[in-house]
Amino acid sequence: MAKVGKLTKLKSAMKKWPSFAKNHHHSTSSAAVSDELSEDNNLHVVYVGQTRRPYMLRPDIISHPLFQELVDRSSSRSIEQDREIVVACEVVLFEHLLWMLKSGQEGGSVEELAEFYTY
């Protein structure tokens, strides 16, 4: 009987999935808005992972040596277009990296950490 309940929950989640994906789709107009926001707030758009998830980052994060090493390693694996900053890193790991940089809990050498975070 427990399997039936799990299957029902799974079906329910699968039905909601398409509407969830539609709500989180970025259009070119939203990209233009994010460009305007980045200019106004001095934030930079960074695209992370294979899905190219956008992040708005402050200049102090962008200029950090570890972040610069990630961008350098990523640029050899991806094609940069129109000044876009692309980081070849899993999104979950990138969020951990941001937490480390913001909290000042960086440990280890820049090269070792960059190798850990990039794919």
Swiss-Prot record:
Keyword Secreted in annotation: no
GO biological process: cellular response to hypoxia; ethylene-activated signaling pathway; response to auxin
Keyword Methyltransferase (UniProt): no
UniProt keyword terms in alphabetical order: Developmental protein, Ethylene signaling pathway, Growth regulation
Top-level taxon of the source organism: Eukaryota
Other known facts: Plants silencing SAUR78 exhibit increased sensitivity to ethylene, while plants over-expressing SAUR78 display reduced ethylene sensitivity. Plants over-expressing SAUR78 exhibit increased rosette diameters.
Family assignment from sequence similarity: Belongs to the ARG7 family.
Function: May be involved in the regulation of ethylene receptor signaling. Promotes cell expansion and plant growth.
Protein name from the UniProt record: Auxin-responsive protein SAUR78
Organism, scientific name: Arabidopsis thaliana
